[in-house]
Design a protein with these regions (language model features):
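Disulfide-stabilized extracellular ectodomains of secreted/luminal proteins, especially beta-rich
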Residues: 2, 6-7, 11-233
Length: 233
């Protein structure tokens, strides 16, 4: 089953992720537990029909680029273009939609994006680029927001996503790239988000940044030119 209108990179990402997820070995046991080697999460015998994988599709959605697995391994959260999804993956190889919440860029931001000569067909949208587990009840998400990065907390209820409140959306500069094609990285450690991305509209100011948590915001100084202008995260 083919995904509708998905770019090759996004299509391949989901396929590779599910394939690797089912074959990924569990962590080695702690010392003193017999010294057994890594054990596979799932075992299949040759010829077993359950080895086949199904591909998820949802009409009107594309660019399933950002993935987050829940702690219990039963839910896969997916950041797409202008939406965040929760997929049930309890049945190996058969992802099913649990629920989905829209998070589009505002019409004002889309208009500003197009005015700055960006494409209103391929670029002026909110591409979800950061999706991390903040605590047991919230995810933290950031997106390009039509070349005006934004972030928000997403509340969870029984692993389902609750709607995003407009007044809870924050500036995401330094956490998400402006341009969806720019490389980026983000990891949450002890309640603090460490991110690396481009910090301006032109994509010429790379930055490393620490946000969230109780510590003050910390970031690299662009004037020191410690990072090369073409840095890739």
């Amino acid at each position: 089953m083919a995904l509708p209108s998905l770019g090759q990179d996004s299509w391949s990402l989901l396929r590779v992720f599910f394939f690797q997820l089912f074959l990924l070995p569990s962590l080695p046991p702690a010392s003193g537990t017999g010294g057994q080697g890594p054990m596979p999460r799932v075992k299949y015998h040759a010829g077993d029909g359950h080895r086949a994988l199904s591909f998820f599709q949802q009409k009107g959605l594309r660019d399933f680029d950002t993935l987050l697995l829940s702690d219990d391994g039963n839910t896969l959260y997916v950041g797409a273009r202008e939406a965040v999804l929760a997929l049930n993956i309890q049945n190996p190889g058969i992802p099913r939609l649990k629920n989905m919440i829209p998070w589009p860029a505002s019409e004002r931001k889309k208009t500003e994006c197009a005015f700055k000569k960006k494409s209103n067909e391929t670029q002026c949208f909110n591409f979800i680029r950061v999706l991390v587990s903040y605590n047991a009840t919230h995810l933290y998400a950031c997106g390009t927001f039509a070349f005006s990065p934004a972030c928000t907390f997403i509340e969870l209820q029984d692993s389902l996503l609750l709607p995003i409140l407009i007044d809870k959306v924050m500036d995401g500069k330094g956490q998400s790239p402006f341009d969806p094609v720019h490389k980026h990285t983000a990891v949450l450690v002890d309640g603090m988000l460490y991110s690396g991305t481009m910090n301006n509209f032109l994509g010429s100011e790379p930055i490393l940044m620490r946000t969230l948590g109780s510590q003050p915001v910390l970031k690299t100084d662009i004037f020191l030119r410690w990072l090369h202008a073409d840095a890739s995260f």
